[in-house]
Amino acid sequence: MRTSQFLLATQKETPSDAVVVSHQLMLRAGMIRKLASGLYTWLPMGLRVLRKVEAIVREEMDAAGALEILMPGIQPAELWQESGRWEQYGPELMRLVDRHNREFCLGPTHEEVITDLARNELNSYKQLPINMYQIQTKFRDEIRPRFGLMRGREFVMKDAYSFHADHASLQVTYDRMHLAYSNIFTRLGLKFRPVEADNGSIGGAGSHEFHVLAESGEDDIVFSDGSDYAANIEKAEAVPREKARPAATEELRLIDTPNAKTIAQLVEGFDLPIEKTVKTLVVHAAEEGKLIALIIRGDHELNEIKASQLEQVASPLVMASEAELRDAIGAGAGSLGPLNLPLPCIIDRSVELMSDFSVGANIDDKHYFGVNWERDLPVPTVADLRNVVAGDPSPDGKGTLEIKRGIEVGHIFQLGTKYSEAMKCQVLGENGKPVNLAMGCYGIGVSRVVAAAIEQNSDENGIIWNDTLAPFQIALIPLRYETDAVREATDKLYAELTAAGFEVLLDDRDKKTSPGIKFADMELIGIPHRIVVSDRGLAEGNLEYKSRTESQPQAIAVADVLSFIQGKVNR
């Protein structure tokens, strides 16, 4: 491809509304253009990368035995009402009414549509298992679209759905898809981690997320330094570092604490170790009209996902208001504690192992110091309530936990029979009786993968593509292309490289575009290999080669360039 025949839309300046690196570089490299909030047009440079991601996803899905289909982007409300998600889904679901006053939505996901297809096309266990996928545009009406393609409203997604006669069959396909996803991200050349995850609004049982490691990631992912254990922050089990509770050494005493409304103020004002304090968080209980207290150590954070999954706690999690606290306890949020609290309590595992700690007295501006379990109050229900922190023991007993930032690019779920029961998706089993189909669901954010790859692979000069994802593998830059010798050598090499199957971008812009601008553009775009043809080099029988990841170019004999490039480019 010659730049004279291509839409080379690079920009020198960074748009003011672009915050993350991938958004900045995709705009500057001429990969995308913004149409409206969260909506982007893919330009030729970007689309070449997107299609490469799609091709690898498609190859691995086909190899895993999945069948490609294509479902409508607009879905009838009746299916969502049947599954129960029409009412459950928030304003992210874009709802439409057609000219006949029938309700539809723009599909953010396709569980309902695929389940409807399965119940109409499958009738016997002999047709199972079956796994179907599509690569299609999705729409979610995000309240604050941001970070370019990282969190847009319209995006390209690969979503697959499998159907099974039993859970054992589902597990086999789930494991196969886990391997397929690992193969996909390995082939894409990304540093990634599969982690245990919560199922969220999709529902069901087991689930794993696939995260590309990047400091700009929105998610904290947790993994052991001594084993394969990995989970996202919502799912990671928090194991106390302490093995046993120390013996009590202090007497219980009631202290006036008028200026200690927060843990930080209590610690600073009374010179307390923060690990000797607790937070008492009151939330709505599962029993309507009731409240329950969740208690964690002062230096820990409540894991709202874990808390909302406790049978005693209302889901979604709702914090008690100040008025509710006053009515139920008679004190404000900054003075609450488990001692003499007229509410049921659940304490975190690490709180159970505390001694000589301080708690709110359930009286405004007062705290108890020197509190000890069993002596001063009984140990209530114990549960895992907190987020893990770096250095915690790994739940599998091997090593300690590390935490890194990640960008979620894939998620696989074992849905079980949630949708098949709601929508009566059944086949006749081996015994001739109807069986609700077990389902799996497997998604990859294809367009997000492109952005995540840039977040992981860029420098101050631009994007750093690997040979697999690069829009072009080679940038061929002639200096003084208007001269006969340079033009002849360039055109000959271009023909040889393209005939050998390389993807080459020949920068044939005229002399008004300086060599420095050409070099800067190709670095910005991130093309992995650069060959420069010049009068001086040709006079010495050489061309100049430079890798995107190297600082210095090297001279290559003209006769050796093709074999040299064949050894450099990973195909």
Swiss-Prot record:
EC number from the UniProt entry: 6.1.1.15
Report the locations given in the UniProt record: Cytoplasm
Note the InterPro entries from the entry: aa-tRNA-synt_IIb, aa-tRNA-synth_II, aa-tRNA-synth_II/BPL/LPL, Anticodon-bd, Anticodon-bd_dom_sf, Pro-tRNA-ligase_IIa, Pro-tRNA-synth_IIa_bac-type, Pro-tRNA-Synthase_IIa_type1
**Enzyme class (EC, first level):** ligase
The keyword Aminoacyl-tRNA synthetase belongs to this UniProt entry's keyword annotation: yes
Pfam families in the cross-refs: HGTP_anticodon, tRNA-synt_2b, tRNA_edit
Its recorded reaction(s) are: tRNA(Pro) + L-proline + ATP = L-prolyl-tRNA(Pro) + AMP + diphosphate
Q: What is its main location?
A: cytoplasm
A GO cellular component entry from the record: cytosol
GO BP of this protein: prolyl-tRNA aminoacylation
- Provide this UniProt record's keywords sorted from A to Z: Aminoacyl-tRNA synthetase, ATP-binding, Cytoplasm, Ligase, Nucleotide-binding, Protein biosynthesis
Molecular function via GO: aminoacyl-tRNA deacylase activity; ATP binding; proline-tRNA ligase activity
NCBIfam families given in the database record: PRK09194.1, proS_fam_II
> Briefly, what is this protein's role?
Catalyzes the attachment of proline to tRNA(Pro) in a two-step reaction: proline is first activated by ATP to form Pro-AMP and then transferred to the acceptor end of tRNA(Pro). As ProRS can inadvertently accommodate and process non-cognate amino acids such as alanine and cysteine, to avoid such errors it has two additional distinct editing activities against alanine. One activity is designated as 'pretransfer' editing and involves the tRNA(Pro)-independent hydrolysis of activated Ala-AMP.
Q: Domain note for this entry?
A: Consists of three domains: the N-terminal catalytic domain, the editing domain and the C-terminal anticodon-binding domain.
Partners and quaternary state? Homodimer.
**What protein family does this chain belong to?**
Belongs to the class-II aminoacyl-tRNA synthetase family. ProS type 1 subfamily.
Name of the protein: Proline--tRNA ligase
Q: What is the lineage of its organism?
A: Bacteria, Pseudomonadati, Pseudomonadota, Gammaproteobacteria, Pseudomonadales
Question: Which gene is the coding source of this polypeptide chain?
Answer: proS
